[in-house]
A protein has these predicted regions:
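Electrostatic cytochrome c docking/interface patches
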Residues: 28-65, 157-158
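Bacterial signal peptide processing site
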Residues: 22-24
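Conserved beta-strand positions that form and line the central face of beta-propeller blades
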Residues: 51, 95, 121-124
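C-terminal motif of bacterial Sec signal peptides marking the signal peptidase cleavage site
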Residues: 17-20
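Flexible coil segments in periplasmic/lumen-exposed cytochrome c-class electron-transfer proteins
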Residues: 26, 44, 67, 103, ...
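Short Fe-S-cluster ligation motifs
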Residues: 100-114
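Bacterial N-terminal signal peptides that target proteins for export
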Residues: 1-9
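Sequence/structural segment immediately N-terminal to covalent heme-attachment motifs in c-type
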Residues: 55-81, 86, 109
Length: 158
């Protein structure tokens, strides 16, 4: 009997809580606080340097690795071109050419690729990608092409 009473009493509270959890995009202040926290508190390895040489071959290797491992969510150009769900995720898939992503150091970008960013949709890939693959992707991110210039990922055009 006490469990039934507790369940009946808790049901309206649960309903009110769920109603209050409506998914709204974050405001400017909330976004600024979260971005500050990501850059200063959650993402590490700020001083780690990229050992991959900044050469056309290094950039091409990064583009190749990016097209295999990252393009499904970020598009071939890292700006979500042709990714049908990118703007419907919560939070939306960011443009990696944008100021927020480009303001990370190379070491921080490697850390993000290694460990992901929770609770966003960015998974970690430590153990799946080699350090050289990750560093080459970081190098590619520093040399992104114009939005849409590489077309859409084949997986969405076939």
């Amino acid at each position: 009997m006490p469990r039934v009473v507790l369940a009946i009493a808790a049901a309206p509270l649960l309903m009110l809580t769920l109603i209050g959890c409506k998914a709204n995009p974050p405001g400017k202040a909330e976004t600024a606080v979260v971005n500050w926290a990501k850059h200063k508190m959650f993402v590490h390895n700020k001083k780690e340097k990229n050992p991959i040489q900044n050469t056309p071959a290094g950039i091409a290797d990064g583009r190749e690795a990016f097209s295999h491992y990252c393009a499904a969510c970020h598009g071939l150009d890292a700006q979500s071109t042709g990714v049908p769900f990118a703007d419907r995720m919560s939070p939306p898939v960011p443009s990696l050419a944008g100021m927020d992503a480009q303001s990370y150091s190379d070491g921080q970008l490697k850390w993000i690729i290694d460990f992901g960013i929770w609770p966003s949709g960015m998974p970690g890939s430590k153990g799946m990608l080699s350090d050289d693959e990750i560093w080459s992707i970081v190098l590619y991110l520093r040399h992104l092409p114009p939005a849409g210039s590489l077309g859409e990922p084949q997986m969405y055009t076939q």
